[in-house]
Structure formats: C-alpha cells, structure tokens
Design a protein with these regions (language model features):
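A helix-centric hydrophobic-segment signal that preferentially recognizes long
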Residues: 2-162
Length: 162
C-alpha cells in the first residue's frame, strides 16, 4: 500500500513538472518573439528619426533642434513612438503646403517615411499579437501559476494609429 501511495505522489510530482516545463517553453517562445519585435521597433524608430531630420532640414530648421533633443532623451519605445508620431504629423502637415509640392527630394523622403510607417505598423502589430498571447497566458490556469512562480509581468500594448 505504501508503494502505491509513493507511486501516485511521484507520478503527480512528475506530471506537475512536465506541465510546468511545457508552459515555461510557451512563455519563452512568446517572450523571444516579443524581444525580436522590440529590436525591430527600435531599428525602425531610429530610421524614422533620420528621415524626419532630413525632412526637417528642408522644411523647418527649428524642428531639427527638437529632433536632436528628442534623440538624446532616454525614452521607452512606447513613449518614443507616441512623441515621434506627433512630431512627424506636424512636419507632414507643413510639407503638404503648396510651396513644397514640386520638391522631388522632399517627395522621396515622404515616400520613405510612408514606407517606414508601414513597416513600423507591421512590427507593432506583431508585437501586440504576441504580447496579447503572453497576457492571456498570465490569466489562464495552469499557465498563470508558471507566470507567478517565474515573476512574469503583463506587457504593454501599443496603440496603433490608422
């Protein structure tokens, strides 16, 4: 009888370990995807700053100082994304003026900016999809136990502008 009880306890412990490792691998998989997306977001944001600097050289020299100060700030990618959108929208509104319509260099930069925005939105969607999966695992049984023991936090979601 003692052997049966020990066998059942050992089986339950082994089952718990297998379940724990299974969900840990799922978490690790999604965290790997999120970190890859974060790296891509940072690269694309750097390219966006470079393009905005070139546009600012043509349109508004005062914005160059603002962008240089922005470049020196220590911001999270979420804050960076929000502030760059507002700066980019201001510059693009100024670029829509009639005096700049015939400027081919500016038009090429705006096209590059639009391509960069499409890439950024795609990477942000990829990040959001994987962050939502991690956040869902954080609230479901038994993966919430794994998340609790490994101290996983919920991830922030980007608000993507249309």
């Amino acid at each position: 009888m003692l052997y049966v009880i020990c066998g059942i306890v050992l089986f339950l412990i082994l089952l718990f370990i297998i379940i724990f490792l299974h969900f840990k691998k799922k978490y690790d998989f999604y965290f790997l995807k999120v970190s890859e997306a974060n790296n891509n977001i940072e690269i694309i944001i750097e390219k966006k700053i470079e393009i905005l600097l070139k546009i600012a050289q043509i349109i508004d020299k005062d914005k160059i100082k603002e962008l240089e100060e922005f470049k020196g700030k220590e911001l999270t990618s979420h804050q960076c994304y929000i502030e760059l959108n507002s700066i980019g929208n201001k510059l693009l509104k100024e670029a829509d003026d009639e005096e700049y319509e015939s400027n081919k260099k500016l038009n090429n930069l705006i096209d590059r900016f639009d391509d960069n925005e499409c890439d950024l939105k795609g990477v942000l969607k990829y990040y959001n999809d994987n962050a939502v999966e991690i956040n869902n695992y954080k609230h479901k049984f038994p993966s919430n136990i794994v998340g609790f023991f490994l101290h996983y936090k919920e991830l922030d979601i980007y608000k993507i502008e249309k």
